[in-house]
Regions:
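One-carbon transfer enzymes
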Residues: 1-238, 243, 248-250, 254-275
Length: 276
């Protein structure tokens, strides 16, 4: 049996990448001799990790209340525990983060130290970045400040929408986790310190690119960028983009780039609008 530094592994989060992480944790448990469990904090109807837990008999808990979740983690303080935070919005309190027995790693959907905080794919698009990526990093008291374990890069293409970029990043995150997980278990993972600029911006969940609004006389390129940054398909991460026409508030329900002229930055849009 390979030498493992942990007695227990906890996976917390939801969605595609969490399911991939849990699958890897489950498949390697007998090799490394740890116990494991899955925690669902934010309940989602199509949760791949929960489905896997139910299908394979993996122990899992639903702890939606933050105080209950914190108490649950406090009960683990006497046990050598690895917590894997994947697509998880719970902020671990200082008592948990600073415990000698607890190690936490987290998936972030940007190339840290860039774009720390929430909804990084949207900000990658809105800020016009040519590329972004994913980061697995150790968790410290500061938001997204811990040492980097592994990163993978992907392009932010001219027509990509937020939900499409997220899909790319989920795939990369699963690949990266498989590459680094065993080294994390054995405490052999390469650690790269982040260079944190003083006063760097941390994006909050309530912040919306462009405040979710545009003017019809804005450049088509800027309008298209905003629309793509807010577009999570059927997931209502942000409210629909808004504009005004003849003094009337309008919501953009659907949009399409119909023409992009060859040597000019020019777009013609087909916008389906709902007048409030």
């Amino acid at each position: 049996m390979s030498e493992c530094q942990f007695d227990h592994v906890v996976v917390i989060g939801y969605g595609v990448v969490t399911g991939e992480v849990l699958k890897t944790v489950y498949s390697l448990a007998s090799k490394y001799g740890y116990t494991y469990e899955y925690i669902e904090h934010e309940v989602h109807p199509f949760n791949a990790a929960k489905k896997l837990a139910e299908a394979e008999g993996i122990p899992y808990n639903i702890l939606q209340d933050k105080k209950d979740l914190t108490r649950y983690f406090e009960e683990l303080l006497m046990k050598k525990t690895l917590i894997i935070s994947a697509s998880n919005n719970y902020l671990f309190p200082e008592k948990i983060v600073s415990s000698e027995n607890i190690v936490i790693i987290n998936f972030h959907n940007a190339l840290l130290p860039e774009l720390p905080g929430r909804n990084a794919p949207s900000w990658s698009i809105y800020e016009g970045k040519d590329y972004t990526g994913i980061t697995w990093h150790y968790v410290t008291e500061g938001v997204d400040e811990g040492d980097i374990i592994v990163q993978k890069k992907c392009d932010v293409t001219a027509d990509i929408r937020a939900y499409e970029l997220v899909s790319k990043q989920m795939r990369l995150a699963g690949e990266a986790f498989d590459e680094c997980y065993e080294s994390v278990l054995m405490n052999h993972a390469t650690r790269k310190k982040q260079v944190i600029e003083k006063g760097r911006k941390i994006y909050k969940s309530y912040e919306i690119p462009g405040n979710g609004c545009f003017n019809l006389d804005d450049s088509p390129k800027e309008i298209y960028k905003l629309l793509r940054a807010l577009d999570y398909g059927k997931n209502n991460i942000f409210p629909p983009a808004r504009t005004k026409k003849n003094g009337i508030d309008i919501q953009i329900r659907r949009y399409r780039s119909m023409i992009m002229m060859k040597d000019k930055i020019a777009y013609i849009f087909h916008l389906i609008m709902k007048i409030n």
